[in-house]
Amino acid sequence: NNVIKNANLSIKREKEKVFVLNNEKAYQYDALVFACHASQVGELLNDSSSEEEEILSLFEYTTNNVLLHHDSSLMPNEKSLWSSWNSFKKNKYDYVSYWMNNLQKLDSKRDIFVTLGNYPDVDEERVFKKIKYEHPLYSEKTIEGQKLIRSIQGKNRTYFTGAHLSYGFHEDGIKSSVEVIKIING
């Protein structure tokens, strides 16, 4: 039940146990679950097998600019056309705007949006927050990685979960975690 956040960690896997080392402290576990991007595993796992490296390298990521705002200029002109997800390809811009009031049933008099991708400039006074996220980049390699990941689940007492193992939604991260729990519990 140890949660270690923002720490300088290293991992040592042995036949019967896994050790997570944090500076001079060692935590012993029966198994290790990586609930992170596949690209982040290599930073933590310094004894990865060539099979693990090969499979995890199939998952690629892209940086997305994300905007939390209340500027309706990034939505369809007619409000009757607004939906929870609104996709746009306009000139050099390619973005998605989520209407959070509808998607999350927000109780707000103000319309709130999350926009990601390459979007036009907006009125800064209507911006709550700008964020950069790494999202899975889907390709044939990703689909191959999703198939092959099963072959390394549990090897060296190590398991992998994440939204990248399906369609990339938060729910997919939960789904893959439940699958790992079922494998661990037999």
Q: What is the predicted function of each stretch?
A:
Residues 1, 29-30, 155:
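Short, well-ordered alpha-helix to beta-strand connector turns
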Residues 10-136:
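Mid-domain catalytic core of redox enzymes
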Residues 1-9:
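A conserved beta-strand/loop element that lines the FAD pocket in flavoprotein oxidoreductases
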Residues 93-186:
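Conserved flavin/dinucleotide-binding core of flavoenzymes
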Residues 6-7, 23, 161:
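Conserved beta-strand termini and adjacent loop/short-helix elements that scaffold enzyme active sites
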